[in-house]
Amino acid sequence: MKQVVLGTHETSRWPEFAGSTWVRLQYMLGLTKLGIECFWVDRLAAVDPLTHSHTLEYLVERFDRTARQFGFHDRYCIVYNDGEKHFGFSESSLKSLTESAHLLLNISGHLPPSSQLMRIPRRAYVDVDPGFTHIWATQVDMGLGRHNFFFTTGQNVGTPHFKIPLNGVNWQAILPPVALDHWPARIDGSCKRVGTVGDWRGSQHAVYEGEYYGGKRREYIELLHLPRIAECAIELALCIGPEDWEDIGLLKSSRWKVLDPFLYAGDPYSYREFVQTSRAEFSVAKSGYVKSNSGWISDRTACYLASGKPALVQSTGCEWKFPGQKGLITFRNLEEAIAALKAFDRDYDAHCRAARQLAEEHFNSQKVLASVLSHVGM
């Protein structure tokens, strides 16, 4: 049986960031269904009980719980503090795996040169932050040279439409995979929630040619008066840090409903329930995705589509990928956002069916990951 290792960084540190966990889960579940023996190795830096809200024991227990719930409790290893401890399978098993595995999928390229996993012959850098990754690569060593395959969720990367130079790297565009068995359609016209879950600012920031590429805050502020003008309640389960708490009042005064993401979507199951009990997704994109014209499509949006929920999302230049389709509506400004909110409700059932069809045709993990394996010669 072919073996693939999913290499990640600090996923176990933040169990309440369930959307990030699902990004990795889709690969585990999808590859397993393809008949691949897939292993998850997460690199976790030291946990200081004085500064971190969770103990190491709690973090390991939460990760193990997720692994058991999704059937890979014997196929994960948390490498703690550069190998001081190993949780899940043992250090010796990890060493054996590096000698037998056929492919490493290095999510976001966070694994350092010293990682044992970098000995695996096929090493693929999987970029999930197009635009940011490519700007950073023009400024610092991102470790791209330690890989021999390169995948990105930016559909425009490598085309004349993308605004950031590639420095000779041959990126292959892929869509975010969704394990459809775990995301069944739940079309229900009685669902009311229109909104999304995510970060207000996020951790991705970059400056390129004097221009700032950042998170979602600025994009939401541009649409501040949307709920009042469109007469539509929009619910945002957003992680907003203390430095931006004043923004919560600003949003609420403009008739946005702000929810606690950790309460409503703080683990993989509640995250899925939040998505699947929604009427539709409404979300902006990080300004870095928009300004670079990356063609990025959110893994979260893919989950909404799989659930049979229309997605109304800010344009990043991906429209050419889905020409004339219902189910996925993009907007560039306030006027187009208002039109999008009105459009999906005029033929709601048709948009729901189209959303699921888009997921089956384009985001199905069986198709996306089979193409990845084919590209690397597996």
Annotate each PLM feature.
Residues 1-4:
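Extreme N-terminal starter segment of soluble prokaryotic enzymes
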Residues 6-161, 265-270, 274, 290-292:
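Extended catalytic core of nucleotide-activated donor transferases of GT-like folds
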Residues 10, 14-15, 19-21, 25-26, ...:
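Catalytic binding pocket for nucleotide-activated donors in carbohydrate/polymer assembly enzymes
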Residues 28-37, 67-75, 145-149, 171-173, ...:
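Structural alpha-beta junctions
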Residues 36-39, 123, 194, 234, ...:
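Hydrophobic anchor at the start of a short beta-strand
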Residues 113-119, 142-144, 160-165, 246-253, ...:
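Short loop/helix-cap segments at secondary-structure boundaries that form the rim of catalytic
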Residues 116-131, 166-184, 307-309:
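P-loop/Walker A phosphate-binding loop and immediately adjacent motor/lid segment at beta-alpha junctions
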